[in-house]
């Protein structure tokens, strides 16, 4: 392996891409695999340069005229006309000893010509917009990531957000990839793409809009992984529900016998599910609740969201109470639970197909950063980032409304069915704990609905099969598995053991809520005196990473709290079977995978600052374990 010539922190001169100009830069890091140095210019720009494009400071002689600029953002066009030119840069210098005979008007023409040549040289730099993947969520299934322990003091400083053009430069770039200058002449189609990255409007102030590139490094195993997930998840839901209905749901009786096809389909059940979905959509459209703005998109826009999830939950609860009072048979949902899950699955597939077809006509800047250009993968991950019908945001609505509120409704039905089947005058203590724990989780998510706007689901992932199936099928029908299990497999829970489980639940909830609240408070106002005791690491993006408090304990304290709560609402089911613990097993695997995605993205975005953060906070989720 070739030895490195420069070390981190060393100040050197780096060649500006596509030109012969060298500027003062600081070495941030070195990639042994690609043999590229990550450097930072004085204006904050970070590039990857080859070693041949970096020179030590001593190899440059300082000129009195200051012909070598200290920052790539400084242009010679801003110099005073009376300042003498560098000998190497003078376009028309008279022989030594002679007097300049050029008129003032001719001098201006020569200077203007020189400025145009320099601008044309710099504009030939090949530009590759870098889309940094935002992520994090503090509610529901997916919870906050370290990404949102940050606060950007300058709202549009990030390269993926709005970039303001100076009157002097008339152009801007986001992230660059250095190419040999022999390749500056490209095909016409490449040149036309570059023109989209340069703003040349006559207005003194312009806005540069970055288009959303498509990913090349596919997640979830790429296309084969997406196909397996799309086939495997519906089969998994079906097998779980069938197994739970058996008298003995142990592993020795797996797989369960499959019912006849006519038992899996009933048109009336489909009508019930559609009614539920559209009633929740109607609640979402009610003009009540706060209207919040989302994070800036790549073109600088901020979408508006109506935050009335808690109102929808209250209206749903009132409607259910009225239904019970009027004698509506809610047990219908239990007796047709399997058909209801299949109806929701079919609806999610049709919704995913609609979303993909409509995304084919969506502008490029509205596509998801996770999209790839492959039809199968994009159907799975989602091609359009924020599909909307007018002001109705389909992805935001499905994240918390039909599935999460439906989860609570299913739990209530299971509680009523336990009393009916087991001939109880009151629900069992185990059923009460399961319902109470999960109700608290859902209400907390709806109460903090605004935190969803900074989640990976909203900011990064498109709306496709992955989120549609997860929100509409996976959450309500697998997260309610403990209550479904207790209907046919009762478990008598003693009060001392119940007290321990309650304490465990409260411990997990305190960690989960305090970590997310601390993160959200720091993101909104990092100068809050209440947060003055927290230590941070500043990053080159202008944001800071928390390295004390809950976020100095582990990198994902909210994940830790989430997993403790998941264990607490599985324990009331006892230890006779493994089935009630499916959620904690699945959720652990999900959060470990999610943490790995977050780690990869943060390392690319923050570079050396993220390395320092990992040294300060070595444990990812489980302290002293992982």
Curated annotation (Swiss-Prot):
Assembly with partners or alone: Interacts with CBX5. Interacts with DNA. Interaction with DNA is sequence independent with higher affinity for supercoiled and relaxed circular DNA than linear DNA. Interacts with lamin B. Interacts with CLNK. Interacts with TMEM147; promoting LBR localization to the nucleus inner membrane.
UniProt membrane topology term: Multi-pass membrane protein
Biased composition (Basic residues): 73-90
List of residues that carry Phosphothreonine: 128, 211
UniProt comment concerning the protein's domains: The Tudor domain may not recognize methylation marks, but rather bind unassembled free histone H3.
GO cellular component, one term: nuclear envelope
Modified residues (Phosphoserine): 59, 67, 71, 86, 90, 101, 103, 138
Chain ranges of the Tudor domain: 1-62
SMART domains assigned: TUDOR
Organism whose genome encodes this protein: Mus musculus (Mouse)
Subcellular location: Nucleus inner membrane; Nucleus; Cytoplasm; Endoplasmic reticulum membrane
Transmembrane stretches, start-end: 222-242, 269-289, 310-330, 337-357, 427-447, 458-478, 492-512, 572-592
Name this polypeptide is given: Delta(14)-sterol reductase LBR
Post-translation changes: Phosphorylated by CDK1 in mitosis when the inner nuclear membrane breaks down into vesicles that dissociate from the lamina and the chromatin. It is phosphorylated by different protein kinases in interphase when the membrane is associated with these structures. Phosphorylation of LBR and HP1 proteins may be responsible for some of the alterations in chromatin organization and nuclear structure which occur at various times during the cell cycle. Phosphorylated by SRPK1. In late anaphase LBR is dephosphorylated, probably by PP1 and/or PP2A, allowing reassociation with chromatin.
The UniProt record lists the keyword Lipid metabolism: yes
Tissue expression from the record: Highly expressed in the testis and lung. Also expressed in the heart, ovary, kidney and liver.
């Amino acid at each position: 392996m070739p030895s490195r010539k420069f070390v981190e922190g060393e100040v050197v001169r780096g060649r500006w891409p596509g030109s012969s100009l060298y500027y003062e830069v600081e070495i941030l890091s070195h990639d042994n695999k690609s043999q590229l140095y990550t450097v930072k210019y004085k204006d904050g720009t970070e590039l990857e340069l080859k070693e041949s494009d970096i020179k030590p400071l001593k190899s440059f002689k300082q000129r009195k005229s200051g012909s070598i600029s200290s920052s790539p953002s400084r242009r010679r066009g801003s110099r005073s006309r009376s300042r003498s030119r560098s000998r190497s840069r003078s376009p028309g210098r008279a022989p030594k000893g002679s007097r300049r005979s050029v008129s003032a008007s001719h001098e201006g023409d020569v200077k203007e010509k020189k400025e145009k040549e320099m601008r044309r040289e710099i504009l030939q730099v090949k530009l590759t917009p870098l889309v940094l993947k935002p992520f994090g969520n503090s509610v529901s299934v997916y919870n906050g990531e370290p990404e949102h322990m940050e606060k950007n003091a300058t709202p549009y400083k990030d390269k993926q957000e709005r970039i303001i053009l100076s009157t002097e430069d008339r152009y801007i770039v986001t992230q660059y990839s250095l190419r040999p200058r022999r390749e500056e002449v490209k095909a016409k189609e490449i040149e036309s793409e570059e023109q989209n990255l340069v703003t040349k409007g006559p207005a003194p102030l312009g806005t540069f809009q970055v288009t959303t590139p498509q990913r090349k490094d596919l997640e979830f195993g790429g296309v084969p992984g997406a196909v397996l997930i799309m086939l495997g998840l519906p089969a998994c839901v079906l097998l779980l529900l069938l197994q739970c209905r058996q008298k003995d749901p142990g592993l020795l009786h797996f797989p369960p016998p499959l019912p006849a096809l006519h038992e899996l389909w009933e048109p009336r059940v489909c009508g019930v599910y559609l009614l539920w979905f559209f009633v929740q959509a109607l609640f979402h459209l009610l003009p009540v609740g706060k209207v919040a703005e989302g994070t800036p998109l790549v073109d600088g826009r901020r979408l508006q969201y109506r935050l009335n999830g808690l109102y929808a939950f209250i209206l749903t609860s009132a409607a259910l109470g009225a239904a019970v009072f009027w004698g509506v048979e809610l047990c219908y949902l239990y007796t047709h639970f399997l058909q209801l899950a299949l109806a929701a699955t079919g609806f999610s597939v049709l919704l995913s197909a609609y979303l993909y077809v409509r995304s084919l006509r969506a502008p490029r800047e509205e596509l998801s950063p996770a999209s790839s250009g492959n039809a199968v993968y994009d159907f799975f991950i989602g091609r359009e980032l924020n599909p909307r019908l007018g002001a109705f945001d389909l992805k935001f609505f499905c994240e918390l409304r039909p599935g999460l509120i439906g989860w609570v409704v299913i739990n209530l039905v299971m509680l009523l069915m336990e009393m009916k089947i087991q001939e109880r005058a009151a629900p069992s203590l185990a059923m009460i704990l399961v319902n109470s724990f999960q109700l608290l989780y859902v209400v907390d998510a709806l109460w903090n609905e605004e935190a969803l706007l900074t989640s990976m689901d909203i900011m990064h992932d498109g709306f496709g099969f992955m989120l549609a199936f997860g929100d509409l099928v996976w959450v309500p029908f697998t997260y309610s598995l403990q209550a479904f299990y207790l209907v046919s497999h009762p478990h008598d829970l003693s009060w001392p053991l119940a007290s321990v489980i309650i304490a465990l639940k409260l411990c997990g909830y305190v960690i989960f809520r305090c970590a997310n609240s601390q993160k959200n408070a720091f993101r909104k106002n990092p100068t809050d005196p209440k947060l003055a005791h927290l230590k941070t690491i500043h990053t080159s993006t202008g944001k800071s990473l928390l390295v004390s408090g809950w976020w100095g304990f582990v990198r994902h304290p909210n994940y830790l709290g989430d997993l403790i709560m998941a264990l607490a609402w599985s324990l009331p089911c006892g230890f006779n079977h493994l089935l009630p613990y499916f959620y904690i097993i699945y959720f652990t695997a999900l959060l470990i995978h999610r943490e790995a995605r977050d780690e990869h993205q943060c390392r690319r975005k923050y570079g050396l600052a993220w390395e320092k953060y990992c040294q300060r906070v070595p444990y990812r989720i489980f302290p002293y374990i992982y």
